[in-house]
């Protein structure tokens, strides 16, 4: 007879969880940041608010964003005028959009990841889906299972309303699943659509306007598993260690509330200060066991909540400008795509590392860190190990 401990030992993988493939997707509608204030104030019938428009123009100019991708087109917004007002009851209209678009965009990213992985989708054992865009039952995980033609007994995990830190959360969960279930192959999908947060401007709520200047739509998908099959599966990054923490004295730093008017976001001005104040402690906890204290010697993937957060983190840790290059590049080309952002940065980094002829997927370096920041204020930390190219 086999003991329980022997069964448990047999269930565990031998090696660390490894990212085996990455796919990304964005809506076709591309919005140039330089002309967005004109479009935004026109479509929301707010052109008479000239001072507010000038403020918004300055926000967009300082955002370090060149372009974003959005499901919401001029045509869709004209058909749904309640979405263009500030705080008008519009949840039904928003839900009708995202319940369809979140799985559709997620599928696009997942198909690319599965293709790169090179294995039949019947080998996917677990599915993690994450979105801050809408809520439904059965959820986006169920819809994706159907859209992709996955087996009905795939083990599903649906994460709704987590916010911008959740790109780290899905990696942490995927790591635990892959390492504790021998042979598991986890499909991770983050899909974000700003149709829930778009609304017209308000003179009294400038934090809402900040969101209108930063957020974009996008999806990212990964295949995660331990003990890659030689010659068939090609590792991209290994996951070494993960943590989640609530920053002290940060309550109300970032809040989101689902209301009749959609999802409202509230930001304190000092979010960059809270993040930079707590980041050193998170790094020491993560890298002291590895004997690493020079944070310029690792590669960096940070959720680009906005340029001010990146600036303060760089300053606090005396990071060289090139450390945040991949992060800033994604912010510039896509805006803040909430949970999908850090996964898109992972993809950009491994591609650029190969293009530049570097030795590893992590800009030629061995170890790196991935940070997610979001409501709470919650900080997710993931230590990554790159793979030789």
From Swiss-Prot:
| Catalytically driven reaction(s) | (E)-4-coumaroyl-CoA + 3 malonyl-CoA + 3 H(+) = 2',4,4',6'-tetrahydroxychalcone + 3 CO2 + 4 CoA
Q: Name one GO molecular function term.
A: naringenin-chalcone synthase activity
The Enzyme Commission number assigned here is 2.3.1.74
Instruction: Report if keyword NADP is assigned.
Output: no
Q: Which organism is it from?
A: Medicago sativa
Read off the Pfam families from this record. Answer: Chal_sti_synt_C (PF02797), Chal_sti_synt_N (PF00195)
Any idea which residues are catalytic in this one?
Answer: 164
Q: What PANTHER family is this protein classified in? A: CHALCONE SYNTHASE 7, HYDROXYMETHYLGLUTARYL-COA SYNTHASE
Enumerate the UniProt keywords alphabetically. Acyltransferase, Flavonoid biosynthesis, Transferase
**Known CDD domains for this protein?**
CHS_like (cd00831)
Query: Looking at the keywords, is Transmembrane present?
Result: no
Record protein name field:
Chalcone synthase 8
Note the superkingdom of the native organism.
Eukaryota
């Amino acid at each position: 007879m086999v003991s329980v401990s022997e069964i448990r030992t047999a269930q565990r993988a031998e090696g660390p969880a490894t990212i085996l493939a990455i796919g990304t997707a964005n809506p076709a509608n591309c919005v140039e940041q330089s002309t967005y204030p004109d479009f935004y104030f026109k479509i929301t019938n707010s052109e008479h608010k000239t001072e507010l428009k000038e403020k918004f123009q300055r926000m967009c100019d300082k955002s370090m964003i060149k372009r974003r991708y959005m499901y919401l087109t001029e045509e869709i917004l004209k058909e749904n005028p309640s979405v263009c007002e500030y705080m008008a009851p519009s949840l039904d209209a928003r839900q009708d959009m995202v319940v369809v678009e979140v799985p559709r965009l997620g599928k696009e990213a997942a198909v690319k990841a599965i293709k790169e992985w090179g294995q039949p989708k019947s080998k996917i054992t677990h599915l993690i889906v994450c979105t801050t865009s809408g809520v439904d039952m059965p959820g986006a995980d169920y819809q994706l299972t159907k859209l992709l033609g996955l087996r009905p007994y795939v083990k599903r995990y649906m994460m709704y309303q987590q916010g911008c830190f959740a790109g780290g959360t899905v990696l942490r969960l995927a790591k635990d699943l892959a390492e504790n279930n021998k042979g598991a192959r986890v499909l991770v999908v983050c899909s974000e659509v700003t149709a829930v947060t778009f609304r017209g401007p308000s003179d009294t709520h400038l934090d809402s306007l900040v969101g209108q200047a930063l957020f974009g739509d996008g999806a990212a998908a990964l295949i995660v598993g331990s003990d890659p099959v030689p010659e068939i599966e090609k590792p991209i990054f290994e996951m070494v260690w993960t943590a989640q923490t609530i920053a002290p004295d940060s309550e109300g730093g970032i809040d989101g509330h689902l209301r009749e008017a959609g999802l409202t976001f509230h930001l304190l001005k000092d979010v960059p200060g809270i993040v930079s104040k707590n980041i050193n402690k998170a790094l020491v906890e993560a890298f002291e066991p590895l004997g690493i204290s020079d944070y310029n010697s690792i590669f960096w993937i940070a959720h680009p909540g906005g340029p001010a957060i990146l600036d303060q983190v760089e300053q606090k840790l005396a990071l060289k400008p090139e450390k945040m290059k991949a992060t800033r590049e994604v912010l510039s080309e896509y805006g803040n795509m909430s949970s999908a952002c850090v996964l898109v940065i992972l993809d950009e980094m491994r591609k650029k590392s190969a293009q530049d002829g570097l030795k590893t997927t992590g800009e030629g370096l061995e170890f790196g860190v991935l940070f997610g920041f979001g409501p709470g204020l919650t900080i997710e930390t993931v230590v990554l190990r790159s793979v030789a190219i």
